[in-house]
Amino acid sequence: MPRPRRPLLTRDRIVETALALIDADGLGALSTRRLAAALGVQGPSLYNHFATKDEILDAVADAVTGAVDTGGFASRDWVAALRDWAWSYRRALTAHPNIVPYLAQGPGRRPAALAMADAVYGGLVRAGWPPARATHIGAALRYFVAGSALGSFARGFVEDPELYAAHYPHLRQAHRLAEHQQSVDEGAFALGLDALLHGLAAEYTRTVDTVESARPNG
């Protein structure tokens, strides 16, 4: 009877398995030895596809970032595009929170992250934002999204009513926050995003008015 064939080792399979290990046990738990074992191969086999562990991590980071939708910058007004992008970005990161610290190191050499930054910056500049301000806006949204994905505010409170009632009277209901994690965390994100976009919209109006008034008449 022929022996069952092992699944073909590919870059995509390596990346998917590495991400699954990171999701399960954290970024620090990933090693080439453990990854090879999970794939059912010897460690050196990985180096036919990736030269180093950092290359694997970059590919994992790129796979996560590649799921972010930036299509709104080509078809919608800049406020709607930023909103859609921020929510899509948050969904991609909260699905894999353990990789967020690595993603936070910056786009650097990662194609998907650079493509995302290019789409955001290009969309904002086309909308009339000054280049420097477009850079600031993209960075601000990125900080906001990444920070929200690093951990849950609601889950940071223990389910012990006595702890809060005895020492922190204004937090007497805090033990219930974990029950409402999704609504609390998403509601907080929506509030912050709305405030940020509202402020940017007001600034945009002032910026456009300034540019228009500076143009020569006639």
Q: Which stretches of residues belong to each language-model region?
A:
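Helix-turn-helix
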Residues: 13, 17, 21-55, 59
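Hydrophobic alpha-helical connector segments
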Residues: 69-113, 131, 141
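Short, basic, alpha-helical segments at the C-terminal edge of helix-turn-helix-like DNA-binding modules
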Residues: 63-67
